[in-house]
């Protein structure tokens, strides 16, 4: 279930809140949970016009989500690789961004094993657990809600 967030400012790094942009986090996470290609495509369109400081992580995650919805195996793999390159590039540029690491954890937990994209789960889980209390409240709520159905996150939150 998606939380009813309003549009919020998402810092590009936890330590540098001056570098931020507006993204409709509620719509983004709703599309991430959805099986609707229409919702996912709408988010991809929105993200394509977002500023570069957050665009690649969110766009990469959404493209990987699209890969999981449908199509032939070759096109799904191509989309997944394209999204992975964007997300991993964003994390490499901003490794202290807990939300980027959360996006990767969501994808890695739910990606088919055959893709071999599971190697950062422990590291990301530990980083998210360590950073959780300093994150914006609406992001904490999003993560806590995901934690309820996650088999790997294991946050101790009420």
Per-range role (PLM):
Residues 122-158:
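Terminal, low-structured helical/coil segments at or just beyond the last alpha-helical repeat
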Residues 52-53, 97, 135:
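Residue-level recognition of tetratricopeptide repeat
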Residues 30-44, 75-84, 117-118:
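Helix-turn-helix repeat elements of alpha-solenoid scaffolds
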Residues 31-33, 65-74, 110-115:
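Short coil/turn linking the two alpha-helices of tandem helical-hairpin repeats
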Residues 78-85, 115-134:
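TPR/TPR-like (Sel1-like) alpha-helical repeat modules
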Residues 55-56, 100:
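TPR alpha-solenoid repeat register
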